Amino acid sequence: KVLAPAEEAPAEAPAAAE
């Protein structure tokens, strides 16, 4: 997902979700 919101917790940056 290119426009994946932080709420979706993108697999590209799982650490960014926290």
UniProtKB/Swiss-Prot annotation:
GO CC annotation terms, alphabetical: extracellular region
Localization per Swiss-Prot or TrEMBL: Secreted
Signal peptide: none
Keyword annotations: Antimicrobial, Hypotensive agent, Secreted
Superkingdom of source: Eukaryota
Any single GO BP term: regulation of blood pressure
Tissue: Expressed by the venom gland.
Location, primary (coarse class): secreted
Family statement: Belongs to the non-disulfide-bridged peptide (NDBP) superfamily. Long chain multifunctional peptide (group 2) family.
Function per UniProt: Antimicrobial peptide. May also inhibit angiotensin-converting enzyme (ACE) and potentiate bradykinin (BK).
Protein name in the entry: Probable bradykinin-potentiating peptide
